[in-house]
Structure formats: structure tokens, C-alpha cells
């Protein structure tokens, strides 16, 4: 009998295909409970620490909404300047204090690997909400759930990733999940922002196939197009960012030249890479994608806390 065993959610490499299929099933169940008004109270008496040491709108509010909709409560800190870390306190010590207050912690931090440090300090569950240019596992899980919800399947899809494949942690994370499925990827980026080799190595021995290109017209063959912004805050040289920031733009004309049902995704926020004239197309799914994020995180909070919701 299958048993899900992930208390902490730190990295997409921790998930097997069985885990992913189980999470999709459990999220469907959570969505049904939520829509029927029966999810509220499942986490009554539980307290979430929402620790965001790097800017966030969607992820922070999504987790906080998820906890509130389950009947739990939360305490939060936003930015280094509003925490004792600004006084020199280590992340380890901060987490030891959080453990005394809360049942579960969600953390976003600009340093890659920080979530592992946080999880290593405490016995409560820790969920990585983004660590620098590294991983963003819950975004990847909601992206996978969005693809299933919008397309009805994963197997056999052609999926295009467009933009910053070097620094885009949402791409790094989602590719690690998609490797378990027989899909084909178009990795569309300028040469300077190719997918790093360490992520390509993770794909070896899996049923996924992929190809790299600089040509945005590869989107025409895609069933799903995942657009990302160029990550300005990750560039060591701002001149390089200025050179690349507007290299791709997905607009209505490009989408209409693609397959009729190409699903357009974006983790948001967007800058110039995705035109607002796409918003009114029925296959523009990025706002639905954000909505799916709440029920996915509702399911993950319950599973990490070991709370049953069958």
C-alpha cells in the first residue's frame, strides 16, 4: 500500500512519480472539500509561521489564505529588516524560536539551500517557499496540478519553457517533476540564460525528452507554454540584464499562431515578457494557475502536519 512520507517540502527531487500522482489525487479531494465549504476547521488549533525574508505577494498570500481557509492561524515576518536577523541572529536560532511558537513553518529566503538549514534546526515541518535561484517546490507542484487540470493529462504533452532558464527557480523545480512523465520540452532562452547543467543531469534516465533553442517560434508546437520573466534581482551585472530583459515577448499574435488550445502559464509577476493582450484568450491560464495554488497548498499543509482529510 502506498504511504506518503514527506513532512518537509524542500526540493522537487524528493518526490517520486507515485508521490506526485498521490498529491494530485489528494488535491482533487481538498478542492472538493473547499468548494463544498467542508475544509474549514481541518487545521483548527494549528499555527503557521510565515517567514518571508525575500519579496513575495502570491506565494505568501497563497499560503496564508490556505491556512486561514483550513481554520488554522498564522504569525508572520516579512523582510530581514523586520526580524532579529537584522540584529545578527542566525537563521538557526530564529528557527529554534519559531519551533517554540508554531506547528509548521513556511520560509522564503534569498540564499540557496537556506530551507535545508531551517529544517535541520527544528522538528516541526518546514516548507520551502523559494530559496534564491534554487528551488520553489510548492510552485512546481501547483504548476503540475494546473497542467493536469487544464489539459486533463501530462503524458505525451509538448511543453515550452520561455525566458530565464538560468535563474528561474520555478523552471528548475517544475522540470524536476516533469522528468517522471513522457513529455517533450522546448527550452527557449538566449544562450546566456540556458538551463544550468546540473538540472540537465537530473533528467538522465527518465522518460522526458528535451531540446534547446533560441527561437521563440518553437512555442507553435507546444501544448503548454510556460513563460517567465528575466530575473533582474539574480544578475551579478545589471548591464547584462538590460541587454536581455526584453529579448522575448509572448503576445496575442504569437499565441494565435500557435496550436488553438496551447495553454499559457506564468508563475507571475510578469514584466514585459507576457503581453496583457493575451489575458482575454480562453487558453490564458495564469490567473487560474494562481487560484489552484491555494488548494494545492491547503493539501500540502495538511499532509506535512499529518492531518487526514479523506
Curated annotation (Swiss-Prot):
GO BP terms: namely: 'de novo' pyrimidine nucleobase biosynthetic process; 'de novo' UMP biosynthetic process; amino acid metabolic process
UniProt xrefs under Pfam families = OTCace (PF00185), OTCace_N (PF02729)
UniProt superkingdom? Bacteria
Asked if the keyword Heme belongs to this entry, the reply reads no
SUPFAM superfamilies linked to this entry? Aspartate/ornithine carbamoyltransferase
Q: Give the record's pathway.
A: Pyrimidine metabolism; UMP biosynthesis via de novo pathway; (S)-dihydroorotate from bicarbonate: step 2/3
Keyword hit for Magnesium: no
Binding residues annotated for L-aspartate, in chain numbering:
87, 169, 229
Q: Which class of enzymes does this protein belong to? A: transferase
Which function does this protein serve? Answer: Catalyzes the condensation of carbamoyl phosphate and aspartate to form carbamoyl aspartate and inorganic phosphate, the committed step in the de novo pyrimidine nucleotide biosynthesis pathway.
* Record note on quaternary structure: Heterododecamer (2C3:3R2) of six catalytic PyrB chains organized as two trimers (C3), and six regulatory PyrI chains organized as three dimers (R2).
User: This protein is called what?
Assistant: Aspartate carbamoyltransferase catalytic subunit
| Organism of derivation | Leptospira biflexa serovar Patoc (strain Patoc 1 / ATCC 23582 / Paris)
Provide the organism lineage as a comma list: Bacteria, Pseudomonadati, Spirochaetota, Spirochaetia, Leptospirales
